[in-house]
Every structure is written in structure tokens, then in C-alpha cells.
From Swiss-Prot:
Its main location: cytoplasm. Transmembrane segments: none annotated. It is found in: Cytoplasm. The active site is at residues 129, 239. Catalyzes the 2-thiolation of uridine at the wobble position (U34) of tRNA, leading to the formation of s(2)U34. It catalyses: S-sulfanyl-L-cysteinyl-[protein] + uridine(34) in tRNA + AH2 + ATP = 2-thiouridine(34) in tRNA + L-cysteinyl-[protein] + A + AMP + diphosphate + H(+). GO terms for molecular function: ATP binding; tRNA binding; tRNA-uridine 2-sulfurtransferase activity. It comes from Prochlorococcus marinus (strain SARG / CCMP1375 / SS120). It comes from the Bacteria. The record marks 155, 387 as: Interaction with tRNA. One of its GO terms (biological process) is tRNA wobble position uridine thiolation. Its EC number is 2.8.1.13. This is tRNA-specific 2-thiouridylase MnmA. Keywords: ATP-binding, Cytoplasm, Disulfide bond, Nucleotide-binding, RNA-binding, Transferase, tRNA processing, tRNA-binding.
Amino acid sequence: MTITPKNKRTSSIPKSQTATIGGEEVLKKLKGVEGDHSIAVGLSGGVDSSLTAALLVEAGWNVEGITLWLMSGKGSCCTDGLVDAAGICEQLGIPHHVIDARETFQREIIESLVKGYQEGMTPSPCSKCNRFVKFSPILEWAEQNLGLKRIATGHYARIKHLQEPIKISSAKENQIRRHQLLRGLDQNKDQSYFLYDLSQEILEKVIFPLGELKKADTRKEASRIELRTAEKPESQDLCLAEHHGSMKAFLDEYISPRNGEILLSNGQLLGQHDGIEHFTIGQRKGLGIAWKEPLHVIEIQSSTNRVIVAPRSEASRDNCTVGSINWVSIEPPSKKTIVEVQLRYRSKPVLATLTPIKPLKKDIENDRPYRCNLQFQSEQFSITPGQAAVFYEGEILLGGGIIEGN
């Protein structure tokens, strides 16, 4: 679906307002980008993607907005997001295109998410969604239908383009690839963790204008430009949870109740549950059992349909296995390498020794033929299978994969 003005509209960005210092720097860099200044912007209807489009327009780029239709119904990924994105495009005087991605989203995200929960994991769908549903499809569609070879999004991350590969200190035999993925400068908003699955081919064509802004500056810039989404609140939940009301409601829609046992780590029966999909490693609240001390989930057994709980002291581990690894900014290490590992979004990176191991057949078939063992320098609480483990050296995102287990 495409909504294109018959006659080119004039942007309603106020001309008299002066950009913030951060905004001025972004505009200067956007104006200085080499090559064709025509670009597609992924618009969700939120303030971040709205400002991304607005700054590009203000910097003189030829901008076209693209919104993915992921689900039917209300919510930021559904009708509400489409309406707000269309309104922003009207305000900026740019065309708005809607891609019906519901079938892809159902296949690549919903079905795999349900399967993961049934297997006792806690999947992290956002990284996979970025890879399979957002960046690649938008780039392909924009090039085929609009002749555009670049895309911008409102993610808080940065990309550094190098003329030639260079060495880095973490693994002297490894070369950094030409297009490095870096953390966003706003440490509280950095979203590089969710982008570890992007390829070099994608990074070459992507621009993240907000990567050097703080969230507060984004709000100020959006207010300066008088964007209609300037005060729109951020979504606090996974889009599926927001769409269904809660994650439990989403899972109940796709997975039938299946009663099982809740056991103490010594084998003592403590209670019953109605589905392993409602539990995650480290969980303490909502277990439905009473005990003399707080208990945490330490294991979810899909084969026996059992949930194992124990005191917090038993919920920490000093190692894990990671599979389906995508090496973003360096070539795959062939030897042991010291890396900083982020085990969940906004968690503090911890040091670990990464040892490459033999890949699984499924990883090879999915073009992710890399696995590793991580040995942490100290025990980590609630290492959760299904979540992403992302490797850094300082601000450089080296790569990442999916936690398989201990």
C-alpha cells in the first residue's frame, strides 16, 4: 500500500527554530554523507523514527517513509502505529508506503517464539525481527519499488565505515570488518544489543541519525520541529504483549494448558503448574508455591514438563554455551578470546573467555555456523536460554548469538 502526494507537499518543519547542539551536529553529519541523498526511513509511528525522518528532510535528503504492517488490531505495531506514521509523513511532506508484513511476522516471529517457549526457553524476538522482518525486507522493497539503496531507522546505535579492515586488541589474529556496529552514545538508551544479527551488507546501507543523541535531546528536537509525536510515550512492553494485553495472554492464545510439576532442586515436589511457557530462568514471583525462603526458577525441562526451583544461591552460573552466532564487526575468532558480554538489554557487560566450539547442524543450515563456550570471570545470575548474548570490546559490537544453556 502506498500513499504518495500527487503534488510534492511542503514540509511544515518550522524554519525559525534553532536546533539543539546535538541536533546541529546530526544535521551537519547528514549533510556531509557522501553519495546519493535519497533514502527510505523505517517509520513505526514513534518519536524516534519520526525525528529520524524529520532530520533527514531538514538536512535536504529525499526521504520516503515506510511502515511495516505486522499485526491487525490496535497497538504501536498495528493500527495506531500506522496512523501516526502516516500523520508524520503528511506533516513532513513525504510519501508514505505501507508494507503488509503480517505473513512474514507470523512465520518468522510468532511461530518461532511459540516454539521456543514450548521448548522451555525465553526467546528474544526483537533481534530476529530486525533481521528477518525489518531491515532486509525494507531494503529489498525500497530498492525494487523506489530505487532507494539506503535506509534509516530511529535506533540508538552507530556505524563506523572503514576504508580497510584493521586489527583489534581482543584477538590479534582477527580483523575488524569494514562496517563496524557501535553502541549509541546514550548509555541508557543504547539499542545495539538488538542489532547484533545484522549483516555487513545491511550495515553498509543503514544510517542511524539518533546514535549520537541522548533521548532527552530527541524529545527536545521533536518539540522544536513541532512533530505530532513529540510527546508520544514509549512502548514499555514487547509489541506482542502490548497487542494481546500481556505476554501470558499471547501465550495462552497459542499454547494449550499442560499441567506439570514444580520441584525443588533436591527432587521434592512443591506444587503444580499449567504450562512451562509461563516461567523463565531466575523468576521468583508468581510461582504459585509457598516455601520457607524465596525460590527462583533454575531449570525448565520441556521433556518432562517440569519446573525446577531453588534458593538464589543455586540460580547463578559461571559459564554458558552460545549458538547461532553472527560475527558483526570482526571475522570469527579461531582461538580463545576475551570479550565483554551483555546477557540482556541494559545489563552491565561482564568479562568472559570465549572459546569457539563445533557448530550444530541447525546453525549451519541457518547460515550461522558458529558456536562458543563462555567462561565468565564471576558467576552470573539467571543466564537464560533463548536470550541473546552479545559480545563487545568497548563501544564496538563484535557479534552475538543465542544462549543455549550451561
